[in-house]
């Protein structure tokens, strides 16, 4: 059985929890979704989801609690949405603590402020999907020399989803839809990692 930890610090935590449980049910696998807040809890997870919220605050808490060290030391796969995307990168356009486990540079609030939030049809993993964008970041750049990096989706010319190894960073909020496919994809990555 695998354990997917939803980092319960800020953002759409309950929505991520609910859709992760639904994805697990749809996949018919032995797995559980749990809420995690501390490093010792994260250490017991096979994968971690970092939701949206204020990336500066989440980054500070992750560092203060040693969650970043546990994730890095145990090579735990991470799925970051919105602020989670910012935190996964090694660089951003703002001085803040980062998890820095992906060779990407992220631009915060690239699609505007809260009032500029929108939904848009996108294609991800070769399938149609509805992207929900709320103060969404975008990818500024990534290390094109890394063979384990793949772009998963773009909106116009902006990269909005990228994967490196078993880590996935996306700019939008799949937890605010009823569509479990992206969460299922992450869970598959976790399964591939623990096998």
Curated annotation (Swiss-Prot):
Q: So, what pathway does this thing act in?
A: Cofactor biosynthesis; pyridoxal 5'-phosphate biosynthesis
Catalyses which reaction(s)? aldehydo-D-ribose 5-phosphate + D-glyceraldehyde 3-phosphate + L-glutamine = pyridoxal 5'-phosphate + L-glutamate + phosphate + 3 H2O + H(+); L-glutamine + H2O = L-glutamate + NH4(+)
Query: Which Gene Ontology terms cover its molecular function?
Result: glutaminase activity; pyridoxal 5'-phosphate synthase (glutamine hydrolysing) activity
- Identify the Pfam families for this entry: SNO
Query: GO biological process: any one?
Result: pyridoxine metabolic process
> Which CDD domains does this UniProt record tie to the protein?
GATase1_PB
The active-site annotation reads: 82 (nucleophile), 173 (charge relay system), 175 (charge relay system)
State the EC number(s).
4.3.3.6, 3.5.1.2
Q: Quote the InterPro entries the UniProt record gives.
A: Class_I_gatase-like, PdxT/SNO
Family assignment from sequence similarity: Belongs to the glutaminase PdxT/SNO family.
This molecule's function is given as: Catalyzes the hydrolysis of glutamine to glutamate and ammonia as part of the biosynthesis of pyridoxal 5'-phosphate. The resulting ammonia molecule is channeled to the active site of PdxS.
Q: Which NCBIfam families match?
A: PLP_synth_Pdx2
Q: How does it assemble?
A: In the presence of PdxS, forms a dodecamer of heterodimers. Only shows activity in the heterodimer.
Instruction: State the name under which the record lists this protein.
Output: Pyridoxal 5'-phosphate synthase subunit PdxT
Q: What is the scientific name of the source organism?
A: Methanobrevibacter smithii (strain ATCC 35061 / DSM 861 / OCM 144 / PS)
């Amino acid at each position: 059985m695998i354990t997917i930890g939803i980092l319960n610090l800020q953002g759409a935590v309950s929505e991520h929890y609910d859709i992760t449980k639904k994805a697990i049910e749809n996949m018919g696998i032995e797995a559980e979704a749990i809420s995690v807040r501390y490093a010792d809890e994260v250490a017991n997870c096979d994968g971690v989801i970092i939701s949206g919220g204020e990336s500066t605050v989440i980054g500070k808490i992750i560092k203060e609690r040693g969650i970043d060290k546990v994730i890095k030391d145990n090579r735990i796969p991470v799925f970051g949405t919105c602020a989670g995307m910012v935190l996964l990168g090694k660089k951003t356009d703002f001085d803040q603590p980062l998890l820095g486990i992906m060779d990407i540079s992220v631009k915060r609030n690239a699609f505007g402020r809260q009032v500029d939030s929108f939904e848009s049809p996108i294609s991800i993993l070769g399938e149609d999907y509805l992207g929900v964008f709320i103060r969404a970041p975008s990818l500024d750049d990534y290390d094109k020399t890394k063979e384990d990096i793949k772009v998963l989706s773009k909106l116009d010319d902006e990269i909005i989803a990228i994967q490196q190894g078993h880590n996935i960073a996306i700019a939008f909020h799949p937890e605010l839809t009823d569509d479990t496919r992206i969460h299922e994809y992450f869970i598959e990555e976790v399964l591939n990692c623990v096998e």
